[in-house]
Amino acid sequence: MKTKHLRLMQRVYIILFFCFMYLPIAYMIVFSFNQSKGYSLFTGFTFKWYRSLFTNASILHALWVSVEVAVLSAIIATVLGTAASLGIASMSRKSRLLVTNITYIPVVNPEIITGISLMLLFVAYQRFAAQSAWLPDNIMGLPTLLIAHIAFNVPYVIFNVSPKLKQLDIKLYEAALDLGCDPRQAFFKVILPEISPAILSAFLICLTYSIDDFMISYFNCGTVETLPIAIYSMTRKKVSPEIYALSTIMFVVILCIILVSNAMESRSYRRDQKTLRKEGAR
């Protein structure tokens, strides 16, 4: 009897938890199709707020900036983070532990501190560059935004790729070298295919965080507006149904990216387990 009550309480708790988490999002999605501008009564179904959204030049420009920065920063951060992971994996145990702990700092650091510190760095650079004849001094805007996004994305790549490198059997790499491959060929033919799911997953995570970021972008964007900053500017005046439509689109896109990333990780895990079972059977 107690077991049944416990199970019932667990189910009720789970239902309440998910309602608390996702009912506001569901409410927003429903009212993005509301015919009226009000958000207390649903008067009819319409796509006019979505049509209005895609004719808004400032929103489209902010969307383009966000996509451009997200894709570029994700690509660069993935390359840098993967290279860093390979370097960390080749270190001694103490050095690897030290570097890993240092890498944790940007992740656990509050975003407002990261944003302000990067802004101060760029301001200091501009003052130094103003006294130099060969350094560009007017970098506030897209360049600083891109650098800031790369800076906070690299640790996520390292934390995603490093565990996969730990699972990698180094004997495969050594066997490739013994069979006549040079280090570059052994990397591209042995190591890269093994860690490619983690690399792609890290890229998608960087893409998600970059599109969603507000705090760090706000302090380092200069005169450039990303999509979260544009939404914030719109909400300061009045909450329009266009914001509901835009937020719905962002939610769906980010949800799709997360689902793809999780599916890839799950597929990689199943493949690793299958390989381990085959090796155990031998």
Where are these regions (language model features)?
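Short membrane-interfacial helix/loop motifs at transmembrane-helix boundaries
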Residues: 23-57, 121, 220-222, 275, ...
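Transmembrane alpha-helices
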Residues: 13, 18-25, 151, 157-164, ...
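Membrane-interfacial helix termini and adjacent extracytoplasmic/periplasmic loops
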Residues: 38-40, 47, 112-150, 184, ...
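Membrane-embedded alpha-helices of multi-pass transport/permease systems
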Residues: 23-26, 30, 79-83, 116, ...
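Transmembrane-helix boundary motif in ABC transporter permease subunits
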Residues: 1-7, 72-103, 116, 120-124, ...
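C-terminal transmembrane helix and the adjacent membrane-cytosol boundary/short C-terminal tail
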Residues: 2-12, 162-177, 187-189, 244-282
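Non-cytoplasmic
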Residues: 26-37, 157, 198-232
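Interhelical loop and adjacent transmembrane-helix boundary motif
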Residues: 2-7, 50-58, 211-268
